[in-house]
């Protein structure tokens, strides 16, 4: 579609049934109205995403469940990280959160970590975490994990992940199902989703 560019991060299945992509909308671009039979979930990384449900600035988190319908676009332009086809078939829960308007809370089990919960059920846990500069972070990864760096940076197994980096940790990533990261000099703000890869 003219005015919409994509960079695919991950795909399961030959026909894009389950895909994770970074999408850039040029100013004034719009899709035609359509239904998401298997749902969509996204984070607004830049600009303002617009659809039938509202205008969502950078920092917003949205879940449009299976059977939902909308006409997405962006008058000023935007960039989103979007996940398609990764819902339970009977999920009908909408989520629209502007994380700029809600506070984070300290994680009582991990020093140097603050959390903004976004969504949680028996299958997955989605949140934004804020990591203090230089903090050593442990993350439970049973069920798999995905991380997208919104700001700052962190190190994982010698690799530096900076803003707009994406990391996917599969099932049985490490013994004990724990990953360890080192936050960078400016700390890190990371979108995290865990527990959702058990059905792959």
What are these language model-derived features?
Residues 1-17, 77, 81-123, 200:
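A short, N-terminal "cap"/entry segment at the start of jelly-roll beta-barrel domains
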Residues 6-8, 106-156:
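Surface-exposed interaction/gating patches
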Residues 27, 36-51, 135, 141-157, ...:
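Glycine- and acidic-residue-biased ligand/ion/polar-headgroup-sensing regions
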Residues 42-91:
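Hydrophobic, ordered structural segments
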